Regions:
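Charged catalytic cores and adjacent phosphate/nucleic-acid-binding surfaces used
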Residues: 1-28, 32, 44-48, 52, ...
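Short beta-strand/loop segments at the ligand-binding rim of alpha/beta enzyme cores
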Residues: 97-106
Length: 198
């Protein structure tokens, strides 16, 4: 499965990607098999997609969220509800993810809105080691962090514009079931497609 694990929709204040546009572009104009919708502090984009009836059975959409933690951003994959409040503590984020059965990814840890030094000890299942919106040095530091913590590294486009979807992606050795995908990520069965990024 080739998946972009970090994509925003118009339900993130800093993105204008509409739901119809997102699905049409992602499933027809990229080589992706799926995406994770990771809107800021909301799963409304995923909800609207499901309610709309717009569907492509051959294209997987993973319900996810990008939590705006006071010290940085955290991705949680495979969730069906939003947290009851914003600005959660570390313990609340972990509890929320566990209750949902979600996978915690430390997003762009060394970018301006990443966890930075806190990332060294923040509980997570994987680390985003390639993000085109981060500098090469920030991505290198994230990769070293994943290696030192013995955590899988993943890529995410962090797309806020339609043409950025799939700029980087992940080949995940799994079926098209979300549970299999999150399990494979935890087990490190991920190969990054870096496009023009290293």
């Amino acid at each position: 499965m080739r998946i972009d694990l970090h994509v925003h929709t118009a339900y993130s204040a800093d993105s204008k990607i509409g739901i119809r546009q997102l699905l049409k572009w992602s499933s027809n104009q990229t080589k992706l098999d799926g995406i994770a919708i990771t809107d800021h502090d909301s799963i409304e984009g995923y909800r609207k997609l499901k309610k709309s009836g717009i569907n492509n059975d051959d294209f997987l959409v993973i319900p996810s969220i990008e939590i705006s933690y006071p010290q940085g951003h955290i991705l949680i994959l495979d969730i069906t509800e939003e947290p009851s409040k914003l600005l959660m503590t570390t313990e609340e984020i972990i509890d929320f993810a566990k209750e949902q059965g979600g996978l915690i990814i430390i997003a762009h840890p060394y970018r301006f809105n990443g966890l930075r030094d806190i990332a060294e000890n923040f509980p997570g299942d994987a680390i985003e080691i390639l993000n085109p919106t981060a500098s090469n040095e920030e991505n290198r530091s994230a990769k070293l962090l994943a290696q030192s913590r013995n955590l899988p590294g993943i890529a995410g486009s962090d797309a806020h514009r339609i043409e950025d979807i799939g700029r980087v992606s992940n080949n995940i050795q799994a079926s098209n079931e979300v549970e299999d995908i999150t399990k494979a990520i935890k087990e490190g069965k991920v190969e990054i497609n870096s496009g023009s990024f290293e």
